[in-house]
């Protein structure tokens, strides 16, 4: 069955390329690329001969124009979709092409070739709870729109991840300070690259001295602390019961819930057994 291979590429370190990714890049005769120069450089570093490959620019301006091309090419050649770094369609071009194949070419499979993700890397490095999770990607270029977007999600109870360019980082962090009070924030710079660096700070404190160079992932820990009294006993028992019904031990369920809601595990354990 013909397939469109959606291939994740390194976000910084060339060694992030798995044998499966390399095999897919080698096999593809046609590559839809965010930037053909970047893709050719990657293939060169991997020792892949691309002299007989066809490269088609697939950036935000060209993606819709490529729909007819993929329809014609995918029945004749092995076709792949790549972005400059990470996964196509995750804050990069790609989803329009994938959606077209899914809806208009049902006889064509969509095969994702897994690899690195700045979203996952930033989230894991932050050490913040992984769920609920809200991913905003790159925000609007206009400062007023950035403020409006972040205020819209101000009351989201969870972890928020976004990407930012170096020339807008300082401005965006200042908006985050204004919108999210007394909140932990992580900034990852040049993740998996040689000069990778990490910064943690609280929005109630001054911004750290961040090297303004490279690419950035921002993670906001918007899990708000609340006094025990603000959670009803009935709701807490219900949450523990649901976890137990899923096969989780009572002690582990209480520990998990206590960590998530920033409560005392022993108090939850006592509360759960009060009616026993």
Swiss-Prot record:
Instruction: Kindly list the places in or outside the cell where this protein is found, as annotated in its UniProt entry.
Output: Cytoplasm
Report the catalytic activity.
Answer: cytidine(1402) in 16S rRNA + S-adenosyl-L-methionine = 2'-O-methylcytidine(1402) in 16S rRNA + S-adenosyl-L-homocysteine + H(+)
Give the similarity note.
Belongs to the methyltransferase superfamily. RsmI family.
Q: Which keywords fit this entry according to its UniProt record?
A: Cytoplasm, Methyltransferase, rRNA processing, S-adenosyl-L-methionine, Transferase
On the tree of life, the source organism's domain of life is Bacteria
Query: Cross-referenced CDD domains, in alphabetical order?
Result: RsmI
Q: Which Pfam families match?
A: TP_methylase (PF00590)
User: Which PROSITE patterns is this protein grouped with?
Assistant: RSMI
What's the protein here called? Ribosomal RNA small subunit methyltransferase I
Q: Which GO terms describe its cellular component?
A: cytoplasm
């Amino acid at each position: 069955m013909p397939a469109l291979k959606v291939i994740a590429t390194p976000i910084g370190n060339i060694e992030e390329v798995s044998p499966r990714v390399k095999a897919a890049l080698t096999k593809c005769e046609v590559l839809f690329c965010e930037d053909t120069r970047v893709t050719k450089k990657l293939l060169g570093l991997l020792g892949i001969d691309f002299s007989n490959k066809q490269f088609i620019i697939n950036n935000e301006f060209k993606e819709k124009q490529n729909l007819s091309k993929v329809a014609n090419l995918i029945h004749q050649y092995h076709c792949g979709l790549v972005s400059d770094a990470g996964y196509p369609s995750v804050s990069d071009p790609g989803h329009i092409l994938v959606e077209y194949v899914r809806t208009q070419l049902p006889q064509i499979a969509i095969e994702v070739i897994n690899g690195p993700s700045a979203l996952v890397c930033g989230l894991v490095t932050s050490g913040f709870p992984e769920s609920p999770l809200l991913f905003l990607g790159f925000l609007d270029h206009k400062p007023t729109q950035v403020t409006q977007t972040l205020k819209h999600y101000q009351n989201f109870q969870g972890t928020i991840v976004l990407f930012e360019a170096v020339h807008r980082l300082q401005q965006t962090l200042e908006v985050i300070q204004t919108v999210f009070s007394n909140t932990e924030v992580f900034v990852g710079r040049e993740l998996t690259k040689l000069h990778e660096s990490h910064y943690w700070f609280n929005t109630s404190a001054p911004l750290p001295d961040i090297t303004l160079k490279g690419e950035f992932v921002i993670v906001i820990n918007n899990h708000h602390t609340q006094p025990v009294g603000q959670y009803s006993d009935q709701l807490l028992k219900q949450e523990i019961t649901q976890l137990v019904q899923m096969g989780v031990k009572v002690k582990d369920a209480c520990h998990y819930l206590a960590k998530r809601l920033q409560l005392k595990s022993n108090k939850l354990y006592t509360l759960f057994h009060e009616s026993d």
